[in-house]
């Protein structure tokens, strides 16, 4: 687990729990998505690590975000600025998104294929994964020409390697 994730998780969990309590999960998702995009900017990253006081850094970030932050979002920014943790805002958003997907019973599934998949193939994979995971799935498809043929399916819990490259690797291991 990366250090950023370790630092970001408590902030994301607190924000998520607060959002659920306030019935504002979607609003918080949008707020954190915006803040994360702002924090990814190279100039903003340099500013966040500057020697300015935490109050000035927080006030500047809040003014940049403007209407995209409500009072609670501003409080999160102030707290993270006090603790000099504003640079992990993108990781906080990623962790929040994971909590939100878990809450909404959505599993994120990586599908890596040798060739681009058509709609029928992605529908079949989605249906099979929904059945196996007993939840809705969100497919993230990508192409890797080095697979030769087939697909690799990844979730947080397991990997299914149905690629020709994977089969060749397993065969090579058996022969050794």
Curated annotation (Swiss-Prot):
Q: One Pfam annotation, family name?
A: OSCP
Q: Which GO molecular function annotations are given, in alphabetical order?
A: proton-transporting ATP synthase activity, rotational mechanism
Query: What keywords sit in the KW lines?
Result: ATP synthesis, Cell inner membrane, Cell membrane, CF(1), Hydrogen ion transport, Ion transport, Membrane, Transport
GO cellular component terms listed in the entry, alphabetical order: plasma membrane; proton-transporting ATP synthase complex
Locations listed in the record: Cell inner membrane
Give the bilayer topology. Answer: Peripheral membrane protein
Q: Does the keyword Membrane apply?
A: yes
Recorded hits in InterPro entries, A to Z, give: ATP_synth_OSCP/delta_N_sf, ATPase_OSCP/dsu
Q: Which PANTHER family match?
A: ATP SYNTHASE DELTA CHAIN
Q: How does it assemble?
A: F-type ATPases have 2 components, F(1) - the catalytic core - and F(0) - the membrane proton channel. F(1) has five subunits: alpha(3), beta(3), gamma(1), delta(1), epsilon(1). F(0) has three main subunits: a(1), b(2) and c(10-14). The alpha and beta chains form an alternating ring which encloses part of the gamma chain. F(1) is attached to F(0) by a central stalk formed by the gamma and epsilon chains, while a peripheral stalk is formed by the delta and b chains.
> What does this protein's UniProt record list under function?
F(1)F(0) ATP synthase produces ATP from ADP in the presence of a proton or sodium gradient. F-type ATPases consist of two structural domains, F(1) containing the extramembraneous catalytic core and F(0) containing the membrane proton channel, linked together by a central stalk and a peripheral stalk. During catalysis, ATP synthesis in the catalytic domain of F(1) is coupled via a rotary mechanism of the central stalk subunits to proton translocation. This protein is part of the stalk that links CF(0) to CF(1). It either transmits conformational changes from CF(0) to CF(1) or is implicated in proton conduction.
The protein's matches in HAMAP family, at most eight in alphabetical order, are given as: ATP_synth_delta_bact
Could you say which protein family the record assigns here? Belongs to the ATPase delta chain family.
For this entry, the protein name equals: ATP synthase subunit delta
Q: Which species expresses this protein natively?
A: Actinobacillus succinogenes (strain ATCC 55618 / DSM 22257 / CCUG 43843 / 130Z)
Q: Gene behind this chain?
A: atpH
